[in-house]
Curated annotation (Swiss-Prot):
It is found in: Cytoplasm. It comes from Shewanella woodyi (strain ATCC 51908 / MS32). Pathway: Aminoacyl-tRNA biosynthesis; selenocysteinyl-tRNA(Sec) biosynthesis; L-seryl-tRNA(Sec) from L-serine and tRNA(Sec): step 1/1. Disulfide bonds: none annotated. PANTHER family: SERINE--TRNA LIGASE (PTHR43697:SF1), SERYL-TRNA SYNTHETASE (PTHR43697). Homodimer. The tRNA molecule binds across the dimer. Belongs to the class-II aminoacyl-tRNA synthetase family. Type-1 seryl-tRNA synthetase subfamily. Its EC number is 6.1.1.11. ATP binds at R266, S267, E268, E353, I354, S355, S356. The lineage of its organism: Bacteria, Pseudomonadati, Pseudomonadota, Gammaproteobacteria, Alteromonadales. Consists of two distinct domains, a catalytic core and a N-terminal extension that is involved in tRNA binding. This is Serine--tRNA ligase. GO terms for biological process: selenocysteine biosynthetic process; seryl-tRNA aminoacylation. L-serine binds at T235, A236, E237, E289, S389. GO terms for cellular component: cytoplasm.
Length: 428
């Protein structure tokens, strides 16, 4: 969430910045609520001071042998007024907090202003797009012909947007995840982490999925008097980042760099009719996630580095890609700046997103109270959090199947994956 003090003191500037994201901040409502908050705060403090002053006079009256009943009655009346004002203030603060939780992050000044994905800006391309001397097949046809992708059985067992993988294609899917983890842990300095696949509401609130995006989640257990509800993770970003929730990290331990390979679960609310064929948009998919916790002054350099770590996966696999910086109107709710990496898919004759790398600055950290303390600092300060896919495993499999297909329908195994597949050079 945004800094409440900044929001109050820079209301017009905040509204102007948020408008570039297509978010309309109700300035008039917030201004009225803020005036009411100030008034209630002053009234509460004055009542408290009056009650304290009169309470002190009780002892003096007793010492003089005076009747203290009228004073006691006055104290009681002030106490009732104070309780009423406190309750009113608490209700107002709850309303202000709910508004604050619904407001997206401010875009960084370096993010291009634009209304939607058509105004994203390409920053670089890598690799050469292969010319095929035959009609290319998409990953669905390739996978089904090889007996490695079974959509029909998945629909029968569960429903649409699920997959069963078998044989060497399932093995390649596993190999891709292992390769990614090995690359990030041995060359990029991340610590491999095993995390829960179920998270509570505090965790989802901390990373920004709640309260705004509850419909995108698979909820497995409702909240009860005994405890919070649990939901399946939409991304390992949630448990990885929440490791720092309500924690103060020593400056010497920064940066913290974590990676995890997990299944991810998304309802894909609002995606009806989009990417209904194949593995591009699934309710359950695997992803290798990258998370960094850094000092504020290091976060933009960390974003460039993290994006490079995700790009390196594609480079080692020999898959052409392009990287774009998202415009303000296309950024995620909690992001201040995002790079999307898009891999080339021959069957679609276009680039498709395979990774989104974002700097959240202190947006998540403020929600989570994730802080660090410098050796010479009197107080701890908020961390900056970053995350990105390194990569989405299913979409990477799609890219390998399509880019490495041969005319006879077989798939050449990329060299970097062969050690993970027992030296296998070709599928089919």
């Amino acid at each position: 969430m945004l800094d409440p003090k900044f929001l109050r003191n820079e209301l017009e500037a905040t509204a102007e910045s948020l408008a570039t994201r297509g978010f309309i901040l109700d300035v008039e409502r917030l201004s009225k609520l803020e005036e009411k908050r100030k008034s209630l705060q002053v009234a509460t403090e004055e009542l408290q001071a009056s009650r304290n002053a009169i309470s002190k006079s009780i002892g003096q009256a007793k010492a003089k042998g005076e009747d203290v009943a009228p004073i006691m009655a006055q104290v009681g009346d002030l106490g009732s007024q104070l309780d009423s004002k406190k309750a009113e203030l608490a209700e107002l603060l709850e309303e202000l907090n709910a508004i604050a939780l619904s407001v997206p992050n401010l875009p960084d000044a370096s993010a291009p202003i634009g209304k939607d994905e058509s105004e994203n800006v390409e920053v670089r391309r890598w690799g050469t797009i292969k010319e095929y001397g035959f009609e290319v097949k998409d990953h669905v046809e390739l996978g089904e012909t090889l007996g490695g992708l079974d959509f029909k059985s998945a629909v029968k067992i569960t429903g649409s947007r699920f997959i069963i993988m078998k044989g060497q294609i399932a093995r390649m899917h596993r190999a891709l995840a292992q390769f990614m983890l090995d690359l990030h842990t041995t060359e990029h300095g991340y610590t491999e982490t095993y995390v829960p696949l179920l998270v509570n509401e505090d965790s989802l609130m901390g990373t920004g999925q709640l309260p705004k995006f509850g419909e995108d989640l698979f909820h497995t257990k409702p909240a009860t008097e005994e405890g919070q509800g649990l939901s399946l993770i939409p991304t390992a970003e949630v448990p990885l980042t929440n490791i720092a929730r309500d924690t103060i990290i020593d400056e010497a331990e920064l940066p913290v760099k974590l990676t995890a390979h997990t299944p991810c679960f998304r309802s894909e609310a609002g995606s009806y009719g989009r990417d209904t064929r194949g593995l591009i948009r699934q309710h359950q998919f695997d992803k290798v996630e990258l998370v960094q916790l850094v000092k504020p002054e290091d976060s933009m350099a960390a974003l460039d580095a993290l994006t490079g770590h995700a790009e390196k996966v594609l480079e080692k696999l020999g898959l052409p890609y392009r990287t774009v910086i998202l415009c303000t109107g296309d950024m995620g709710f909690g992001s201040s700046k995002t790079f999307d990496i898009e891999v080339w898919l021959p069957a679609q004759n276009t680039y498709r997103e395979i990774s989104s790398c974002s700097n959240m600055q202190d947006f998540q950290a403020r929600r989570m109270q994730a802080r660090y303390k410098a050796a010479d600092a009197k107080k701890p300060a908020l961390l900056h959090t970053l995350n990105g896919s390194g990569l989405a495993v299913g979409r990477t499999l799609v890219a390998v199947l399509e880019n490495y297909q041969n005319e006879d329908g077989s798939i050449t195994v990329p060299e970097v994956l062969r050690p993970y597949m027992g030296g296998l050079e070709k599928i089919g």
